[in-house]
From Swiss-Prot:
Source organism of the structure: Arthroderma gypseum (strain ATCC MYA-4604 / CBS 118893) (Microsporum gypseum)
Binding site for Zn(2+) 2: D195, E234, H343
Subunit structure as annotated in this protein's UniProt entry: Monomer.
Gene, per the UniProt record: LAP1
Protein name: Leucine aminopeptidase 1
Gene Ontology cellular component list: extracellular region
Residues noted as binding Zn(2+) 1 in the record, renumbered to the chain: H176, D195, D261
Length: 373
């Protein structure tokens, strides 16, 4: 139970008993994990201060009593060769930078997408409508494809699109949908174009591409496919933690999860004299899944890779990993060259490359198809 709930009960009792019981007016506190086994109780303001200092964390306040984080990498076999090049290339040919620019213009127009705000709720509702439209336009809904809200104890909901396959084993692609202004989290302007509007519209356009394949649309792929848009990532990976904890509790099988968090900024690399590249995260990920992703990139994308590390609890793939599911992350660049405008009111479309975002969309289409079909 959160301290806030305790305070609410105390306040009720105080009014009933004529204020004979003192009310604790201390700020609500949250239990965070900064490294395996390293926990701390902090206020909301202290959470944001840690975030702005570059310290990521899991918010585990609502974690089930007795939860044990996974410590071993799941033993999962992945394809060692490309098997669906014709199908993937046909899907890739349908990907549209114009769609991505249109969607990101709208998504970044909300005042912010803060997980506790009405704006965060409104943006999630709009995004879910776009996902539903893509499913309906493809006809996949006639074969069981659907999109659903995953509700939390805050305003913004997560979104899960499901395309059934012949087995219940799931291939997941995810991106967080929320945004934050580091100086004024509650009310500040936070367009979040790159962090993480870019990842959100990247996987949305990849979903449209995947839904061009009739084998997948008609539920004939070997595995089930899910696209996730997570709420509350900035506050401690809240949405993805809740989803993957639920999957663990209900015995779901996840073959692999690919996270897309920030997919549009290349200037940092170019200013350093580097080639435009993907940033392949190598820590807190599944090594075999990452090896498979490298193969997909080599086949379907036109830019190279650079290995990089992002630390503990840096993004939503860490939630999958913590719950025992194999996960990986590919970022827009090495972590030290990410978009410097993140968490500010200047995180705008004008700094982004839609050519680079298309490369990420190609990766997602290739990943999903080669692993699920």
């Amino acid at each position: 139970m959160k301290l806030l709930s305790v305070l609410a009960l105390s306040a009720t009792a105080s009014s009933v008993l004529g204020a004979s019981i003192p009310v604790d007016t201390r700020a609500e506190k949250f239990l965070i994990e900064l490294a395996p086994g390293e926990t701390r109780w902090v206020t909301e303001e202290e959470k944001w201060a840690l975030k702005e200092s570059g310290q990521d964390f899991f918010d585990i306040t609502d974690e089930e009593v007795g939860f044990t984080a996974a410590v071993a990498q799941p033993a999962v076999a992945y394809p060692t060769s490309i098997r669906h090049a014709d199908a993937v290339n046909a899907m890739i040919a349908t990907l549209s930078k114009e769609n991505m620019q249109r969607d990101l213009t709208k998504l970044s127009s909300f005042h912010n997408r803060y997980y506790k705000s009405d704006y965060g709720k409104q943006s999630a509702t709009w995004l879910q409508q776009q996902v539903q439209a893509a499913i309906t336009a493809s006809g996949a809904n006639r074969y069981g494809a659907k999109v659903a809200s995953f509700q939390h104890n805050f305003a913004q909901h997560s979104i899960i699109a499901t395309i059934p396959g012949r087995s219940a084993e799931i291939v997941v692609v995810g991106a967080h949908q929320d945004s934050i202004n580091g100086r004024s989290p509650m009310t500040g302007r936070a367009p979040g174009a790159d962090d993480n509007g870019s990842g959100s519209v990247t996987i949305l356009e990849a979903l449209r591409g995947v839904l061009q394949d009739q084998t997948i649309v008609q539920g004939k792929a070997a595995n089930t496919i899910e696209f996730h848009w997570y709420a509350g990532e900035e506050a401690g990976l809240l949405g993805s933690q809740a989803i993957f904890a639920n999957y663990k509790q209900t015995g779901k099988k996840v073959k692999g999860m690919l996270n897309q968090d920030m997919t549009g900024y290349v200037k940092g690399m170019l200013d350093k004299g580097l080639k435009e590249s993907f940033g392949i995260i190598t820590d807190n990920v599944n090594a075999n899944l990452t090896k498979f992703i490298r193969m997909v990139i080599t086949k379907y994308c036109q830019i190279p890779t650079i290995d990089t590390r992002c630390g503990y609890a840096c993004s939503d793939h860490a939630s999958a990993n913590r719950n025992g599911f194999p996960s990986a992350m590919v970022a827009e660049s090495p972590i030290d060259l990410l978009d410097p405008h993140l968490h500010t009111d200047s995180d705008n479309i004008s700094y982004l490359s839609f050519d680079h975002m298309i490369q990420h969309a190609k990766l997602v289409v290739g990943f999903v198809t080669e692993l699920a079909k």
